Amino acid sequence: MPKYDNSNADQWGFETRSIHAGQSVDAQTSARNLPIYQSTAFVFDSAEHAKQRFALEDLGPVYSRLTNPTVEALENRIASLEGGVHAVAFSSGQAATTNAILNLAGAGDHIVTSPRLYGGTETLFLITLNRLGIDVSFVENPDDPESWQAAVQPNTKAFFGETFANPQADVLDIPAVAEVAHRNSVPLIIDNTIATAALVRPLELGADVVVASLTKFYTGNGSGLGGVLIDGGKFDWTVEKDGKPVFPYFVTPDAAYHGLKYADLGAPAFGLKVRVGLLRDTGSTLSAFNAWAAVQGIDTLSLRLERHNENAIKVAEFLNNHEKVEKVNFAGLKDSPWYATKEKLGLKYTGSVLTFEIKGGKDEAWAFIDALKLHSNLANIGDVRSLVVHPATTTHSQSDEAGLARAGVTQSTVRLSVGIETIDDIIADLEGGFAAI
């Protein structure tokens, strides 16, 4: 009698893998949906078995800070969708980004980044990493590969950027930036939060590591926090410059594992080092429940993202023709400075988070927001519900004037995360906002 078998799930299409990859039917109960394994620890078969798991000879579950069957199912599914060899889930997207950087850089090291960043990432880079002795340089023009090259220093350990920036809504030329990174023997880390693998797969475009907030489009309904890091498995962590290793943490024996060299772990070396080193020590663990919530969202990822983006195109066109709008930042518009990059990369969609400059200033922006009835004014994106926020006084309020300018945020900027409601209702609500100013 035929039985369910997803052992060759990587041969299936994206939508099928969104539902089936990474999770088998529960062996004990035959539960079809993913169970929530709400357990802190897992029983070993023997003393020898316990020793093998602690020595990384067997990568099965030990303690939920490191691995948990519910979380592992999520990680496997995300790795399949993003095209990576290993995924590590975290308690938030910020934790994923932080661990990606700390896996490569320490005191005295340097990171090169696009200036068009989510406000929390900018604060992480400018404040927290600085306290740890890690220097960060913002490239002058992230659309120009030579601007990235000009920012490189002898101690540079990574390049960082966002596929579609929050809130600028530009499109990063990932292949061009990856070429510069690799020319300098460093990896490119891409935040794929707004795109998700449903729209863009950065690892296929030359990136080496992907991070994303699961809180946003992957989960898709504002029900739980989460983050993920995906290892592309292709970067050579043994690379040297002037006869010295660029990434000594990967080729120097780790005393915690009796002399293990992470580079010897092969393709998933980056991801495994994050898991058994940083996640073990910092404890930014994703709960089994939030992992389960994310998996429920991923089931419908492609359907939701298509609706989000079709609605976003219509909203952007509406705003672009409105007399009370000064400017719309949305790469899907043909007059966008990033439309050519979108076409170069062969992208159908450019995300459903966009900003626009309202004519006037903060007072007009606030009046517009306060008059909306369908949109929720809150600090999140990627919800099925349409969302609105004033970035300068919320998500980017910790930035100084230079930081706001880098991110493309002014007092007139309004950010929309376009939901999946009926488009006529979304636009009617926006009309109501404009009528109030």
From Swiss-Prot:
| Activity control, per UniProt | Inhibited by methionine and cystathionine.
Residues annotated as carrying N6-(pyridoxal phosphate)lysine in the record are 216
Report keywords, A-Z: Amino-acid biosynthesis, Methionine biosynthesis, Pyridoxal phosphate, Transferase
What pathway is this protein a component of? Amino-acid biosynthesis; L-methionine biosynthesis via de novo pathway; L-homocysteine from O-acetyl-L-homoserine: step 1/1
Q: Name one GO molecular function term.
A: cysteine synthase activity
> What InterPro entries does this protein map onto?
Cys/Met-Metab_PyrdxlP-dep_enz, OAc-hSer/O-AcSer_sulfhydrylase, PyrdxlP-dep_Trfase, PyrdxlP-dep_Trfase_major, PyrdxlP-dep_Trfase_small
User: Which EC numbers characterise this protein's activity in its record?
Assistant: 2.5.1.49
Summarize the temperature dependence annotation.
Answer: Optimum temperature is 37-42 degrees Celsius.
Do you know what upregulates this one?
Expression is repressed by methionine.
Tell me, what is an example of a GO biological process annotation in this record? transsulfuration
pH sensitivity of activity: Optimum pH is 7.0.
Say what happens when this gene is deleted: Disruption of the metY gene is not enough to lead to methionine auxotrophy, but the metB-metY double mutant is unable to grow on a minimal medium lacking supplemental methionine. Deletion of the gene results in methionine auxotrophy on methanethiol or dimethyldisulfide as sole sulfur source.
Q: Which cofactor does it need?
A: pyridoxal 5'-phosphate
Q: Which GO terms describe its cellular component?
A: cytoplasm
Reaction it catalyzes: O-acetyl-L-homoserine + hydrogen sulfide = L-homocysteine + acetate; O-acetyl-L-homoserine + methanethiol = L-methionine + acetate + H(+)
Assembly and interactions? Homohexamer.
**What family does this chain come from, according to its entry?**
Belongs to the trans-sulfuration enzymes family.
In terms of PANTHER family, this protein maps to: HOMOCYSTEINE/CYSTEINE SYNTHASE, HOMOCYSTEINE_CYSTEINE SYNTHASE
- What's the stated role of this polypeptide? Catalyzes the conversion of O-acetyl-L-homoserine (OAH) into homocysteine in the methionine biosynthesis pathway. Can also use dimethyldisulfide and methanethiol as reduced sulfur sources, leading to the direct formation of methionine. Has weak cystathionine gamma-synthase activity.
Q: What is this protein called?
A: O-acetyl-L-homoserine sulfhydrylase
**Organism of origin:** Corynebacterium glutamicum (strain ATCC 13032 / DSM 20300 / JCM 1318 / BCRC 11384 / CCUG 27702 / LMG 3730 / NBRC 12168 / NCIMB 10025 / NRRL B-2784 / 534)
Which lineage do the record's taxonomy fields give for this organism? Answer: Bacteria, Bacillati, Actinomycetota, Actinomycetes, Mycobacteriales
Which gene produces this protein?
Answer: metY
